[in-house]
Amino acid sequence: MMFKQYLQVTKPGIIFGNLISVIGGFLLASKGSIDYPLFIYTLVGVSLVVASGCVFNNYIDRDIDRKMERTKNRVLVKGLISPAVSLVYATLLGIAGFMLLWFGANPLACWLGVMGFVVYVGVYSLYMKRHSVYGTLIGSLSGAAPSVIGYCAVTGEFDSGAAILLAIFSLWQMPHSYAIAIFRFKDYQAANIPVLPVVKGISVAKNHITLYIIAFAVATLMLSLGGYAGYKYLVVAAAVSVWWLGMALRGYKVADDRIWARKLFGFSIIAITALSVMMSVDFMVPDSHTLLAAVW
């Protein structure tokens, strides 16, 4: 029973979601030549760091979690694990994860993990989430870190491919997160969390969602234009983006915003999974003949 509680406090669903993006970034950079020990070290290292961040987040948010229907039964809220024990647990997970990334992957992968962790725990969870409508924007940077870590674990450098991944996954986070805030509107309102739909209204949030999906669509195409991914990826990326944008535009005419937002959220997961799979299998080696190479 205790094992289940220690697992739950790490938010395994979030860990799994991040692993999909780590794998996408790693296999994109590997280009068919997979270093399996490096692959395992990277996956486990990122999983431990994400788990650590989630436990710290649970510790920090335990007061507002009590006010939200979705989170009122979390382990720390119910007192199934003490706050002091959770801090020790989170610290140990983080140390193990960072060590694995440093020694098993490379220092760059580790430092990217540190930056993502600091943004999520130190900037987003401790301050921005409670005090700023821009909390989601800041948090999106940490959400994009796993894909970039996976990529840089292979390359050992932050190149244009890593920058494109950072853009794709950061931009994806925004409509994904705003959709959650819309269908969980009352929860966020009750906890006084200043997310965009609560502060500016759902209509404004819909405008932002549409704009971010357009920006996301452009970013996804950059992988192919830069010569990092092939035409199969390009077709899937375009199809996913157009469909997601269509869903967003239909939001202006729906009768029930909550049902629409839940569907938009659900498709966001399908979208990022499809892109991660396609960049894993339809990779390319960039050369000087690509459009982006010519521009840059």
Curated annotation (Swiss-Prot):
Listed GO biological process terms: heme O biosynthetic process
Q: Can you provide one Gene Ontology molecular function annotated for this UniProt record?
A: protoheme IX farnesyltransferase activity
Q: What does this protein do?
A: Converts heme B (protoheme IX) to heme O by substitution of the vinyl group on carbon 2 of heme B porphyrin ring with a hydroxyethyl farnesyl side group.
UniProt topological domain (Cytoplasmic) ranges: 1-9, 57-78, 127-197, 248-268
List the catalysed reactions.
heme b + (2E,6E)-farnesyl diphosphate + H2O = Fe(II)-heme o + diphosphate
Phylogenetic lineage = Bacteria, Pseudomonadati, Pseudomonadota, Gammaproteobacteria, Enterobacterales
Taxonomically, which superkingdom? Bacteria
UniProt-listed NCBIfam families? cyoE_ctaB (TIGR01473), PRK04375.1-1 (NF003348)
Q: Which UniProt keywords apply?
A: Cell inner membrane, Cell membrane, Heme biosynthesis, Membrane, Transferase, Transmembrane, Transmembrane helix
Entry protein name: Protoheme IX farnesyltransferase
Instruction: Give the EC number(s) listed in the UniProt record.
Output: 2.5.1.141
